[in-house]
């Protein structure tokens, strides 16, 4: 899910270092559910029934086939527009990853720091500083304001940051803009997986959760396609950054019509609003049971919204925080950003000299893997996908090590390197990317979910920065083969960790998972 190359810079021939008005509570719940009513009515129309028939000379009736056999499973459709709006934040995340891939050279030339690799790296990496701060403050803010309002508040730095960057005429201005964008991304990337896990019906929570990864992939691909004219127009980067403000407006507007999390509504005592959301998203038959489960969890853990950071040191929260932080450390140290960076040089060796074209191949592979994950995650489960993903990444790394470290025909070596790179990206996208961000809120308690996700993502950003900081030094000192072998070894370690410490959450409601953790500190 979370792929970014925020420190390393690629050049073809070298490596270098709003304000919104809010309707009344119940009125909003009814208005926001208009999406859901439309899609639920469409779902009913899709049902196909069959009639029993009997020929005059038949001795036996042909039994009618139950309608369910032919019914399309569209139970996810009511929640889809709401979680799609939230996933616009991931589209922005992906867009801002890709938007600096090529134009950084033109930006440096126009703003007067061309050739200074430290300043070029700072323009790219200050994004991480903002994202780190955003991830820390996201949890307390969502506890206080709810998901919809927090989303909308933090579209402000996303929009302002893009506009400030687009109009920048000095290094300070571009740094300010990039920091603001990072701040907004840091908050929203924490909110999206939590929002989806709390709004989506249990049966479809995994498939809808992969929209985070899909949104990121689409954002990267769109930014790469939009960046093609930048090769001929040195000022095109301003247009690209102006365009970056538009999804922020769409996110803010869309959240005005999206539903609030029913679990958050219950926490703050808005039971009537929560029932309206559940009825329209999950179905009328789920209302009483869902509210009963919510209240049961609150009775066990307390309904006080102001959970403290120190609570993450107590069981079972400490175990979930440990799993969340460890999964993100392993994800980043398995080398996703290093592989993405070096993939441009790998493609260049086989004649694909355009960095944008090489990145597009990688982006499409990433997108294909995310689509496969959306199909498999609620069938095979989170744990199997996570383990299989890391095993696939390990095999891919060792294949590249073999290709670059052993005396092979040059064409064969290059072909194996390309194959290994694409296999690695696909394997990442099918498990390590989407599952990591999804399983952490699923395991977290309702009381501490925001803070655990904030902690986990802050670890993600620190790990991301460290990998980006040292990757090129390690490659220059030890060679690509050694570094990639270490990535493969970390991938094997991540597969073992996933087997030993993660638990399967497929098909379980968040309340069932939380009660199991509270009662046994484990899930069998």
Curated annotation (Swiss-Prot):
Keyword set, alphabetical order: Chloroplast, Membrane, Plastid, Sugar transport, Transmembrane, Transmembrane helix, Transport
A GO cellular-component term linked to this record: chloroplast membrane
Gene3D superfamilies for the chain: MFS general substrate transporter like domains
Sequence intervals crossing the membrane: 88-108, 122-142, 151-171, 179-199, 208-228, 239-259, 320-340, 357-377, 386-406, 420-440, 452-472, 483-503
Keyword tRNA processing: no
GO molecular function, one term: transmembrane transporter activity
Family: Belongs to the major facilitator superfamily. Sugar transporter (TC 2.A.1.1) family.
Name of the protein this chain belongs to: Probable plastidic glucose transporter 1
Organism: Arabidopsis thaliana
Lineage: Eukaryota, Viridiplantae, Streptophyta, Embryophyta, Tracheophyta
């Amino acid at each position: 899910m979370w792929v970014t190359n925020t420190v390393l810079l690629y050049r073809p021939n070298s490596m270098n270092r709003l304000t919104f008005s809010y309707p009344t509570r119940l009125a909003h719940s009814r208005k926001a559910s208009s999406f859901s009513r439309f899609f639920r009515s469409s779902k009913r129309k899709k049902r196909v029934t069959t009639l029993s028939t009997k020929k005059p000379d038949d001795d036996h009736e042909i039994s009618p086939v139950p309608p369910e056999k032919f019914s399309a499973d569209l139970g996810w459709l009511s929640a889809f527009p709401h979680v799609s709006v939230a996933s616009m934040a991931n589209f922005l995340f992906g867009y801002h990853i890709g938007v600096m891939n090529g134009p950084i050279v033109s930006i440096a030339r126009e703003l007067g720091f061309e050739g200074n690799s430290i300043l070029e790296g700072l323009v790219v990496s200050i994004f991480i500083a903002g994202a780190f701060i955003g991830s820390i403050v996201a949890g307390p803010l969502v506890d206080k304001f709810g998901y919809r309002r927090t989303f909308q508040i933090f579209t402000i730095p996303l929009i302002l940051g893009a506009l400030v960057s687009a109009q920048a005429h000095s290094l300070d201005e571009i740094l300010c803009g990039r920091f603001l964008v990072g701040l907004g991304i840091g908050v929203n990337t924490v909110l999206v997986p939590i929002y989806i896990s709390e709004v989506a019906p249990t049966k479809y929570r995994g498939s809808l959760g992969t929209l985070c990864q899909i949104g990121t992939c689409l954002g990267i691909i769109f930014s790469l396609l939009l960046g093609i004219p930048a090769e001929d127009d040195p000022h095109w980067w301003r247009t690209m950054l102006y365009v970056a403000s538009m999804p922020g407006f769409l996110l803010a507007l869309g959240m005005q019509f999206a539903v609030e999390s029913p679990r958050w509504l219950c926490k703050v005592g808005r039971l009537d609003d929560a029932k309206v959301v559940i009825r329209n998203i999950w179905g009328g038959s789920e209302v009483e049971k869902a509210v009963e489960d919510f209240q049961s969890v609150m009775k066990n853990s307390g309904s006080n919204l102001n959970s403290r950071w120190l609570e993450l040191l107590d069981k079972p929260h400490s175990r979930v925080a440990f799993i969340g932080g460890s999964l993100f450390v392993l994800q980043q140290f398995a080398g996703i950003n290093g592989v993405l960076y070096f993939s441009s040089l790998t493609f260049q060796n086989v004649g694909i000299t355009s960095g944008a074209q090489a990145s597009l191949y990688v982006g499409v592979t990433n997108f294909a893997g995310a689509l496969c994950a959306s199909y498999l995650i609620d069938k095979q489960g989170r744990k199997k996908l996570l383990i299989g993903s890391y095993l696939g990444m390990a095999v891919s790394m060792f294949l590249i090590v073999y290709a670059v470290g052993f005396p092979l025909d040059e064409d064969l070596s290059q072909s194996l390197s390309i194959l290994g790179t694409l296999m690695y990206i696909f394997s990442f996208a099918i498990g390590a990317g989407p599952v990591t961000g999804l399983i952490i809120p699923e395991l977290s308690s309702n009381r501490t979910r925001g803070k655990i996700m904030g902690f986990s993502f802050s670890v993600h950003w620190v790990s991301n920065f460290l990998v980006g900081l040292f990757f090129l030094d390690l490659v220059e000192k030890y060679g690509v083969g050694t570094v990639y072998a270490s990535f493969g070894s970390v991938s094997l370690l991540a597969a073992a960790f996933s087997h030993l410490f993660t638990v399967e959450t497929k098909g379980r409601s968040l309340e069932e998972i939380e009660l199991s953790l509270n009662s046994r500190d484990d899930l069998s």
